[in-house]
Amino acid sequence: MVLQGAKQRLCSSKNLDTCVLTPKYQTAYACEGKKLTIECEQGELINLIRANYGRFSITICNDHGNVEWSVNCMFPKSLTVLNSRCAHKNSCSVLAATSMFGDPCPGTHKYLEAHYQCVSAAQTSTTTNRPSPPPWVLNNGPPIFGNGSGLIHPTNIGGGSGGASAPPRLPTLPGVVGINGNGGMFNVPPPATHATPPGSTATLPGGRLKGVATSTTTTKHPAGRRDGLPPPPQLHHHHNHHTDETTPTKPSGKVPAASNATAPSNTRILTGVGGGGTDDGTLLTTKSSPNRTPGTAASGPSVSSNGSAVRTINNINLNAAGMAGADDETKLFCGPTHARNLFWNMTRVGDVNVQPCPGGAAGIAKWRCVLMKRMPDSSFDEDDEEMAGTSTTTPMSTSGDCLHNSSSCEPPVTMAHKVNQRLRNFEPTWHPLTPDLTQCRSLWLNNLEMRVNQRDSSLISIANDMSEVTSSKTLYGGDMLVTTKIIQTVSEKMLHDKETFPDQRQREAMIMELLHCVVKTGSNLLDESQLSSWLDLNPEDQMRVATSLLTGLEYNAFLLADTIIRERSVVQKVKNILLSVRVLETKTIQSSVVFPDSDQWPISSDRIELPRAALIENSEGGLVRIVFAAFDRLESILKPSYDHFDLKSSRSYVRNTAILTNDSDASAGDLQQRLRILNSKVISASLGKGRHIQLSQPITLTLKHLKTENVTNPTCVFWNYIDHAWSANGCSLESTNRTHSVCSCNHLTNFAILMDVVDEHQHSLFTMFDGNMRIFIYISIAICVVFIVIALLTLKLFNGVFVKSARTSIYINIYICLLAIELLFLLGIEQTETSIFCGFITVFLHCAILSGTSWFCYEAFHSYSTLTSDELLLEVDQTPKVNCYYLLSYGLSLSVVAISLVINPSTYTQNDYCVLMEANAVFYATFVAPVLIFFMAAIGYTFLSWIIMCRKSRTGLKTKEHTRLATVRFDIRCSFVFFLLLSAVWCSAYFYLRGAKMDEDVTGIYGYNFICFNTLLGLYIFVFHCIQNEKIRREYRKYVRQHAWLPKCLRCSKTSISSGIVAGGGTGLGGTNAGTLCSVSTAKKSKLPLGTNDDAHDEQQQQQHMSATEDAIMGASSDCELNEAQQRRTLKSGLITGTLQPSQSLGGHVVLERGNTLRSTGHASPTSSAGSTHLIFAHKQQQQQPPLGEAYYHQPDYYSWKQTAGGMKAQREYYNNAGAATSSPQQAHEVFYWTQKPNSQHGKKKRGGVGAIPASPSGSLHSRATAASQVLFYPSYKKTKPGQQAHPHYAEALDPPQPPNTAAYYQQQQQLRQQRQQQQQQLSSDEEQAEQHAHLLHLQHQQQQQQQRRAGGQQQLPAPPPHMAQYQQEFMQRQYRNKHSNCDLGDAYYNQGSVGGADGGPVYEEILSNRNSDAQHYEVGDFDVDEVYNNSVGTGVFNNMRAAVAAGGSRYGGSLSGGSVSSRNQQQQQHSLAQPISARRCTADEDDDEDEDDEETTAAEQLHDGVCDEEEEDEESDMEDDSHGLPPQSAERMRRLMALQDEDFKRRFQRQQRKHGAPVDYGTLPPGSAQAVIGGAHPEHNGAVFGVSGGVGEGSMRGALRQQHAKSPSARLAVNELFGHGNTGPPLPPANQTPAQKRQQLQKLSPQSTTSSSSHTSHSNPHSHPPHHQQRHLSAMLDENNTVRCYLEPLAK
């Protein structure tokens, strides 16, 4: 090692501006065979003062304490040799060997010693003061201490008590640092109030020594120091201007005290006790820079500081250049103290103080100074803090550029600050609690050891002397080793000497006497008076000595047992040992042998029982030789090993040792450590044959607990002679109580009970939390638990929103496991180890964590299997797979925990906290390994899923697959983030628990990381698994409004039901452009055309679009009203324009989102409920009657607009006065969904027609037996008529005068309404409900035709059929299911009539199932529109479509039907030419049975049946052909679905007509059907659209566009073509009209024009376009859940 020379600057106190630079004196050593390296700073040269190769001290380079070497060994030419190598050089290196210097004293291990100075090159010619020679050269006087030590303190050289003997330099242990000398060592004398203690030497690791300084600066001793130690000096640094205030005072000696202080910058907790090994031979050389050592005043010893030393503590280099101030330096030295009759001087942290053994003993004693964590009752009191605050030390610059003429020198403070912070919580402590006197041996025992090794020595005499010495003399650590060695030697020699005694009795007597002496000696060693002797040994030596004592006693006992040849029992009882030697004849052994007897050993109630069979099988010659022993106080020696502690923390050892010394203050700490103590006396048993062999039958031990309070977890153990430690192998705990434990062992040796100590002052894991962290942990766990519960309730309450899928089941189980983990953790951290719930909590927490990780793995696997199988296109219940997940998850977890319990149940109870298993092999095998396997599998499957998604994204997929792929991609992303958060939470919790146990500095960081990550985990679950789902958001709002127990402010929330406003014309509410879509994506790219308009646009249509932007939804009830402006939603996409939208845009109906999916920005109907959406359609307006004002369907003024033009103004003004202005922005549009189930893969099933209703209650829509084209919703229709007001607070506006001819009908409706309120929810199934509604429409069709004829007044219509009264009676007796809206809309809401007929006509409400399933794709080839158009002349579109299907062979099962748009006159004219084809479809068996009673079977029905049969046969081929078609188009799908739906209802309506004897008129359709024709006197107007059916015939937009634009047959059918408005489009539900539009209608639809219009239409060309009429736009989309949505245009005012 290198020592860097330093110049010591001594400044005069009289002249602060002048400094005299004095080179610093240094000493370096190198053991024989090693190199001595000397190095000075740049610009400085080596100036040698003296040198010697030989030996002047017995301690330097003497690790083994050899005292026979000569200490007067000197090579005279040593200085000459060194000068030739090092003089006037900056650095040099010299080998300390006889080849270089010669051998002045053969047989003595020598060392090279050099005294030198580092002087600047300019001062090499100046004269320097030669310091005094080393003290061991000048002083040879008698000792000054009465303990026989011939040492004096080196500061007393040259004066005081005459000549003093030189202090021997003693070796130290490897890996430790000496305490004195230059370059970072202290040698501080005590205050003048007491005698100067022996000197302390400066040793380096492995006995290597540091240089000794002889500076003479003194500092003031501050008041308040309890230990009487001088504080480190203040260092004032000025750039090139150093002011050192010194006041020389006289210390206790006549020569100024020599001292030098250096504060280390970085240390760590030291734990090694004692030491061993050999010197590594390296010499530690310290580089030192110049420094100042100012004193403050008055008197006191001197402490100088070396501000930039490079030191090594425990083989760790410490850079002291950035050291902290004096407040830290006071904590870097252990104070002087007296221990074991020795005075231990102040010692630097990391150094080992070495000195000769006390008087009467030979050898050396050592004691180390280490840093330890402060205890709560830290000795760093206010006085220390005040002292630390008044003195600061700033590091010196190491460059040497700060000359005394300069102004200032700024010191670096960064490192000092860091060191200051690190050392603030530590304090210097002597370690271990007592000095290490392992090498100290008494002269008496040394004499006995020499005697026992002599050939003719008397063993009995030696044993007697040994027992006397051990009982009367003070022993040291080395004496314990010698004594046990003598015991074993005596027994070995007696084994050979006993043969010299021919007489058996004499032989037994001699051995018995020897045994008595040995037992007495052992008892003396165990006596309390010799406890300090045991503590002189390090823990390893203590275990070795104890093992040697036990084996020596046992060996001597069996020496006697082998000598006895007959049955006999010998008992040796002394103070601390009871020894029993029994020789038994096997024939006399009748039962088990018990030791000890109750009267033999009153000290303890322990007993050991040997079974008879084990004794007999270990007999020899018919005799069984047994040795029993019971020990007192041995339990305080044989301490358990602390291998489960981190040995880097010395506090663990200090606490454990404190139990041995009953030092409660030393054991009090701020961290609950798990301590294992020996909680019973030690009892021993051995058999002669094999002694420690395995037994066929186990022995039974009953051991009494020494401590009954605050102990737990008893463990039966035996002492392993080989490992010198306690082991539990072969022993088990049979039973235990508060005072005793019963053990069973299958071998013999020394037994005891180990138990855990529980700190009575600290009860749980929370005791180590500070106040803030404890609160934060409670808050974090509470937040996470609340959000997990919300997620679970969401999946349960709103399960109708989702298809029951494997992913949903997986997440439910993940949430359950996480909830269990959070709750168990919260309970576990509050439990103590003594709690009965501690083990149970750990077991269940283990199981919950394993289950949670396994579900994460299965979630990743499920995503992977979804991408690699057909599940990508199917999201249905997967019960078999989920059942496998359940079995593997919970079954595997429980199995692992059960195995862990079987292997080692104590794993769950032996840890410090009740939330963590003990870190052993079982823990790593059953906890860490499975968790890592599951996590790695989850990461692997996630990685594979990403690869597959990347591949699929580059291939051409159908729209449905792209949508599903986007959903899976989003799920995988969310799951991966979820996985990362959960891993962070668990890792932070684990490292926090482990770090808190070891008291690591980063423990707090882990704790707060756990708090943050756990809170984020709860928020993530709620946001990304609940809030991000649009359906769940909608269901939350519905749920809030449907429950009366919630606060009214929540149920009447003004937040929009959906996520935006559907507005036309590109404007939203309030005149803003919120509804405008700004995307440049074309409809072609989006694959979902939104709409188009005809080339001709009249002023009326434009006004309608402008007024539609001002509409708003209003949902009202008796207690709340949604009549305010809806919240705007920022649209992130734009208006989708393209070739299909040539002139006008539909406005802000749809938003384009990721994955090329569209989402609505409109509103859902306020009558929607969970799992369904209500769509309300009105009867078509009869435009030739006096125009009736259209009302908003959700407003209470519906009937106020149904008056004539003359009375409309007054009533509108009346309504306006009620508070709702006509100019307020209001709109009403409807939303409905539909989906379709994919092809069934479960074999060929008998399919019903489209819309067939399953037999299960409420329609089991997900049966796998359904057809490929099965529509997954079954509409329910509610026929309502105008009646009482729906809103009492608008009673005047809602009670219009009723026509006189409808009084009887209204009376019937009043009775019917009362029945509805009393008999709700009575229909057993959707099948019954659908049949009921079909019957109602048939009845209403008949009644409405009569009313229209009477209202027209131009012709007399025939009276209603005779069975009309019967229909009305049945109509009143029917029971209906009443659907309430979110705001409790009553029946009156459904009684709001439409504008048809004199009484307004019925309003039909369609309830569509909102199931999350995949829709069936339809291709263009399914509908040959050209053929349909060519065959549609003079026929209804339904008949033409039936013919087209029959001719073309539909692939998808179920017939097609477009909405008929021809007038009634056209249908009547063409009826005779058309082939009547029944509108029946392939129905279920129950539907066919109902039709068997029908007497009429038309040709159309036969044709239809043939088509169904053909479809049944070609099912599988159709499924194959489907994969080769063109990419799907949402418009085709929508057209097909609605056509099938309309046809299904039409079939039911016609069946009702046939059942009641009415003629089946395929041109006369129900008023709710798309083909329904309500003409009468107004034949040119079409009926209202029921559902929204698209037509492909003459009157359809599709046919018109075919004719006008001549599109190719392969062109796709767009949504805007199917649902757009225009001259040829099918009529949609009517839109409200502006006052200007209504006046125009009054002029156009006058009675005169009505006749001419009727006549003209009756004879018009079939190909001519019908006149303009008010229609409403309909836009469609496919949302992220693969559900088709349609939005009707808002009603214009």
UniProtKB/Swiss-Prot annotation:
Annotated GO MF terms: carbohydrate binding; G protein-coupled receptor activity
Disulfide pairings: C716-C743, C731-C745
Alphabetical keyword list: Cell membrane, Disulfide bond, G-protein coupled receptor, Glycoprotein, Lectin, Membrane, Phosphoprotein, Receptor, Transducer, Transmembrane, Transmembrane helix
Ranges where the record places region Disordered: 190-309, 379-406, 1089-1109, 1237-1264, 1279-1362, 1450-1529, 1596-1678
Residue ranges annotated as Extracellular topological domain: 1-774, 830-835, 904-927, 997-1003
Principal localisation: membrane
Record GO biological process: cell surface receptor signaling pathway
Residue ranges, annotated region (GPS): 716-761
InterPro entries named in the record: GAIN_B (IPR057244), GAIN_dom_N (IPR032471), GAIN_dom_sf (IPR046338), GPCR_2-like_7TM (IPR017981), GPCR_2_extracell_dom_sf (IPR036445), GPCR_2_secretin-like (IPR000832), GPS (IPR000203), Lectin_gal-bd_dom (IPR000922)
GO cellular component terms, semicolon-separated: plasma membrane
Glycosylation sites (chain numbering): N147, N260, N306, N345, N405, N662, N710, N737
Biased composition regions of type Acidic residues, renumbered to the chain: 1485-1498, 1508-1521
Cytoplasmic side: 796-808, 857-882, 949-975, 1025-1693
Residues of the site described as Cleavage: L748, T749
Membrane topology: Multi-pass membrane protein
Family in the record: Belongs to the G-protein coupled receptor 2 family. LN-TM7 subfamily.
Protein name (Swiss-Prot/TrEMBL): Latrophilin Cirl
Source species of the chain: Drosophila pseudoobscura pseudoobscura
